[in-house]
Amino acid sequence: MVFALPPRSGGPRRGASWSPDMAKVLIVEDNPANMTLAIFLLQSAGHTVLTATDAEAGLTLARDKQPDLILMDIQLPGMDGLEATALLKRDAATRAIPVIALTALAMKGDEERIRAAGCDGYIAKPLAYRDFLAVISAQLVTAPL
């Protein structure tokens, strides 16, 4: 299932007046509560939100819609988020899109596995408002145009 939700305030896309507060963000998350919270936080910050509930739909949306940032759940049904991220990073059409892992994994070595798959950062669940937006803003500011 895929939804495209505009930001609450609207805004231009990466033109002369683009800012990191107006990004197109793809969320790949199968948990409805986590998805709803992420959508709310992103829209409240002025971002346009695209959503997918599995990795395959996320890969298709990433190729077709070219988001500014992808938030990828690690534990997805079927193909997991690390495998999907590795595929995104091997594809010339999507390799430059920053991917931030959304994960409840907090064991020693998990960050290394997440980075090795190609993720540019990660956010631990449960999502904390300030940490969530700080990581996203940092990635958007440093992402290539």
Each PLM stretch: what is its role?
Residues 62, 71, 84-85, 89, ...:
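Hydrophobic alpha-helical motif in two-component signaling modules
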Residues 29, 53:
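Conserved acidic carboxylate
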Residues 77-80, 95, 107:
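The feature encodes the CheY-like receiver
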Residues 73, 103:
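Active-site residues of response regulator receiver
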Residues 36-44:
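Charged docking surfaces used in two-component/phosphorelay signaling
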